[in-house]
Amino acid sequence: MKYLCLAYGDEAGWNALNDNEKQELLANDRVIRDRGNLVTAVKPQVTAVRNWDKNLKVTEGTDEHHGLPLAGFSIIEAENVEEVIDLVANTPCARANGVIEIRPFWNLEN
């Protein structure tokens, strides 16, 4: 099954880590790729489009509407949600005062 993992966090949490902690967390990201679980991920560039009341607003960067900005997302293939939790629990956003939302995809092939 494939799972969408939304990563929320900000640079302050990341910058608060020492270099060894950062390297350890980035190594955990590499494990997900090396195991073949990572399906895809996005680049950090963001363009936000908002069209409230037919008033189009396009901005470079996140259009923050809550406490933490969306830092990125990935699509991970795993046997179950517990495996995904194990994979993402020690990634940068999960550890640097952020949060990762895990959402399973519908199986639309049947």
Residue spans of the language-model regions?
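Conserved, structured core segments of small domains
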Residues: 1-110
